Amino acid sequence: MPAGLVVLVGPPASGKTSFVRALIARRQIDAEAVVSSDEIRAELFGTSPAEAESEEADARIFDERDRRIVARLATGRSAIAESTNVTPQARARLIAIARRFNAPVTMLRFNPAVTDLVQQYTERRRTDLTAEDVRAYATIMIRDAGADQLRSEGATTVHDVPGRRQATTPAEAAAQFSFV
């Protein structure tokens, strides 16, 4: 993939973080290239769910995410935006940042079967979302994040990342991609 902005697109528990960890473990990317909204949330708010789950908190988290992405793109380095990014509004914000630096936008889609998604979510034992929330994200993904839609929004390239549905581990999926 060319240098620029890589946007991960997928519901919670779809394999985005596992994929990124596999890329790092395989030394395909530097950990510093990954800008994770979950990690920023933890940095800013620790384990205080009451503080971290508000519109004000989300604004702080995504402003910080954007700041980190800008810092990387401004110096010609790639950035990987690791958050759900299933809505056009979320992606528009990222595409606008990339355009400021004439950086290509590669979108990687994580689109597991809903049954696999709910199973993966259950295995994670997270309490910040419900299974119904995860299903809702999947519905939005199906409606608003098809490959043609992503291209029409400004993605230079769109790739589907294989996962459980294709009997592919995160490491096997990571091996199918290369980053410049």
Predicted regions and their residues:
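Conserved GTP-binding G-domain of TRAFAC-class P-loop NTPases and closely related GTPase folds
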Residues: 1-9, 14, 18-29, 33, ...
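Conserved phosphate-donor/acceptor-positioning beta-strand/loop module used by diverse small-molecule
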Residues: 101-120
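Conserved helix-turn-beta segment of the N-terminal RecA-like "Helicase ATP-binding" lobe
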Residues: 97-98, 126
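Conserved nucleotide-binding/hydrolysis micro-motifs of P-loop NTPases
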Residues: 39-41, 86, 111-116, 165-166
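Loop/turn-to-beta-strand initiation segments
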Residues: 75-79, 104-106
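Conserved substrate/cofactor phosphate-moiety recognition/catalytic segment
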Residues: 17-77, 116-119, 123
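Aromatic/hydrophobic pocket-lining residues that form π-stacking "cages" and hydrophobic walls in ligand
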Residues: 68, 94-96
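Acidic, metal-coordinating catalytic cores used for nucleic-acid/nucleotide bond scission
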Residues: 82-91
